[in-house]
A protein has these predicted regions:
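Conserved G/P- and acidic residue-centered "switch" motifs that form tight phosphate/ATP-binding loops
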Residues: 35
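Glycine/proline-rich, positively charged
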Residues: 91-92
Length: 255
């Protein structure tokens, strides 16, 4: 089935409105990187809630060469926003680990900024009127687990969680976003490598596999392995069901 972004919009915006209502929220809080995902989510939020109810947060880690994209995006959408540099917070944690006799691994250094960003977004959300953090991940990233648990995978709900990277771009175009925000190559912000460099295959390959089942066998094996080993990132926190009662409901009904 051919993807029609215009037909998708009405249902998606209605769903976003329902999710915000269920959360008891008013202000959509979004981390702004200036790439296709955060730009498209921000544009969707403006369409769903009105720009006065969308708050963008720019979260550079020290000197960020592409921060101009983030600034240009919030100016284009004319949404309230702020900039909070997470460098000192990230370095503070790493330094305290060193003092405790712990040597941070490379993976720690890669994932910590994402978790600090999410903690900051929630701090901002709790400071604003009924602030709700909206997730900006897409299906392609999530399918291969290219996200940080309790970092960029977090949020109250995920508007793009069932859209591939190419479908996100199509949605962004229908929403009138300038092309520069949609074609900006995503990177981890630390190594200088793009997501696709780190993955070892393209998002297009993931998209073709997810939507059409078409994939080179060698790449399919890589995708399947990453998908299989990353499912824990998206599961509700497992709880041991001990059979004891909670009021009139069993513990099994807790989650």
């Amino acid at each position: 089935m051919e993807f029609n972004p215009q037909k998708q919009l009405a249902g998606l915006l209605e769903w976003m409105d329902q999710q915000m209502t269920q959360c008891g929220g008013k202000t959509a809080v979004i981390g702004i990187s200036g790439g296709k995902d955060s730009s498209t989510v921000a544009a969707l939020a403006v369409a769903a809630y009105g720009r006065e109810n969308v708050y963008g947060v720019l979260l550079p880690n020290g000197v960020q060469p592409d921060i101009d994209y983030s600034q240009a995006l919030v100016e284009h959408l004319q949404i309230p926003h702020c900039t909070i540099n997470i460098h000192d917070a990230v370095q503070g944690v790493l330094q305290e680990m060193e003092k405790a006799g712990l040597t941070p691994s490379r993976q720690t250094a890669v994932n910590l900024p994402s978790r600090v960003r999410m903690a900051t977004l929630y701090a901002v959300a709790q400071t604003l009127p009924a602030g709700i953090v909206i997730n900006t991940s897409n299906l392609s990233e999530d399918w291969v687990g290219y996200c940080t648990i309790y970092g960029d995978s977090a949020g109250a709900f995920s508007p793009l969680g069932m859209y591939t990277t190419e479908e996100v771009i199509a949605l962004g175009r229908v929403l009138g976003l300038p092309e520069k925000f949609l074609v900006k190559a995503p990177s981890d912000g630390l190594t200088g490598l793009t997501d696709e460099d780190n993955l070892g295959f393209t998002y297009h390959a993931v998209n073709e596999y997810v939507r059409r089942g078409v994939c080179d066998p060698a790449i399919r094996e890589q995708i399947d392995r990453k998908h299989r080993t990353s499912r824990f990132k998206f599961q509700t926190l497992p709880v041991y069901h001990n059979g004891l009662q909670i009021g009139r409901a069993s513990c099994r009904e807790r989650v």
